[in-house]
């Protein structure tokens, strides 16, 4: 290879890297990933999947042809989170950290979009067995990461939806859902992040009765507040998609102790301590099919109808 060839190759790599970064900034997948998926779709190479043998057999009976594994990922920076001003810190504080929650939501949206984009390049109708992997935010580092993966599949004898449907249901669960006369509408997910600082009365009660078991009511209330926020968002997404319900709902909760300084702008100086409660909820929205066929399917599964 001549020096001119090496220079041209380096320029090509730099140009492709710049294009990939621009695509990522716009919410798409990198250029190299798209090329690989297009080659997979046209090469006729054997597929790989996360499906077990039983899941593969049942999906085949439903007319779902696995095409390959797909992935979506996003690492998101968390912006500056202000705590609400309060003139009565002695009463405790339970508030939603909307900036942190918003970072989770945006990271998840981009990860889901990239998962669907990868599936589209394979010519898929649906992604089954979606698994979610989330990196808990580090308050100092200020970043969250969201990674999803699953198996892209094509549906025989059915018109393709505009965007591949996403579902965290396994092959067996998709089969049972079809037998019951339902079809998946899509994956729904929500994140709620709350900060709970105990009231002075709660702290005093803990100090005076530290030797006995007792409920920390402020923190319990914070968990309920986070749950109501996350499940409310989950239900809203299902309603927007015309779903009848959500199955397989999973709730994951993480707590982290945090201490910060209280400045004069919020009523005095000192240290304030509390818990950051992060609650993640997700599941698959479903809708009853127009004609529920409880007999074994013959490659005629309908998605979202």
Task: Label each region the model flagged.
Residues 103, 107, 138-144:
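Short, well-structured alpha-helical patches and their helix-loop capping segments
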């Amino acid at each position: 290879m001549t020096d001119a060839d090496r220079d041209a190759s380096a320029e090509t790599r730099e140009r492709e890297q710049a294009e990939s970064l621009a695509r990522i900034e716009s919410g798409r997948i990198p250029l190299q990933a798209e090329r690989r998926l297009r080659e997979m779709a046209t090469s006729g190479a054997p597929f790989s999947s996360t499906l077990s043998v039983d899941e593969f057999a049942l999906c085949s009976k439903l007319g779902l042809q696995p095409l390959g594994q797909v992935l979506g990922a996003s690492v998101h920076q968390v912006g500056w989170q202000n705590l609400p001003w309060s003139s009565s810190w002695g009463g405790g504080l339970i508030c939603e950290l909307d900036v942190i929650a918003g970072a989770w939501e945006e990271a998840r949206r981009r990860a889901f979009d990239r998962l669907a984009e990868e599936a589209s390049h394979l010519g898929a109708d649906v992604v089954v067995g979606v698994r979610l992997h989330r990196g808990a935010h580090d308050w100092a580092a200020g970043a969250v990461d969201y990674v999803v993966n699953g198996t892209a599949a094509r549906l025989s004898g059915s018109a393709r939806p505009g965007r591949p449907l996403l579902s965290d249901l396994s092959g067996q669960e998709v089969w049972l859902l079809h037998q019951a006369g339902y079809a998946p509408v899509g994956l729904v997910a929500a994140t709620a992040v709350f900060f709970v600082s105990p009231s002075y009365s709660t702290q005093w009660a803990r100090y005076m009765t530290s030797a006995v078991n007792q409920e920390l009511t402020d923190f319990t209330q914070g968990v309920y507040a986070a749950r109501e926020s996350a499940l409310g968002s989950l239900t809203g997404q299902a309603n927007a998609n015309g779903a009848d319900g959500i199955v397989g709902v999973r709730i994951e909760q993480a707590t982290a102790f945090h201490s910060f300084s209280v400045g004069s702008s919020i009523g005095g100086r000192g240290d304030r301590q509390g818990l950051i409660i992060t609650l993640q909820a997700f599941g698959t929205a479903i809708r009853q099919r127009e004609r529920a066929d409880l007999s074994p399917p013959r490659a005629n599964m309908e998605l979202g109808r």
